[in-house]
Structures are given as structure tokens and as C-alpha cells.
Swiss-Prot record:
The lineage of its organism: Bacteria, Bacillati, Bacillota, Bacilli, Lactobacillales. This is Uncharacterized 6.1 kDa protein in curA 3'region. Keywords: Plasmid. Has some function in curvacin a biosynthesis, transport or resistance. It comes from Latilactobacillus curvatus.
């Protein structure tokens, strides 16, 4: 029984680690998208001004 409990605890810990990693990646992705969007807005502004 003790072995089974340890196994379950390890599985839960692994799931938490995976979820945390996914969240970190997702946050980084969102920040990248915001930066890209700002960059595109700047490019659009410069393009409009150059015309």
C-alpha cells in the first residue's frame, strides 16, 4: 500500500510540474504575441507615415 501511495504522489507531482511548465510557456507565448503586435503596429504607423 505504501508503494502505491508513493506512486500516486509521484504522478500528482509530475502532473503539477507539467501544468506549471505549460503555464510558463503559455505566458511567454502571450508576451511574445503582444510584442509582435506592438511591432506590427509600429511598422504600420511608419508605413502610413511614409506614404
Amino acid at each position: 500500500m505504501i508503494i502505491a501511495e508513493n506512486f500516486v504522489q509521484r504522478l500528482l507531482a509530475l502532473q503539477l510540474i507539467i501544468i506549471l511548465r505549460f503555464l510558463i510557456v503559455w505566458l511567454n507565448y502571450c508576451q511574445l504575441l503582444k510584442k509582435l503586435r506592438r511591432g506590427l503596429d509600429l511598422v504600420r504607423m511608419i508605413f502610413i507615415l511614409s506614404i
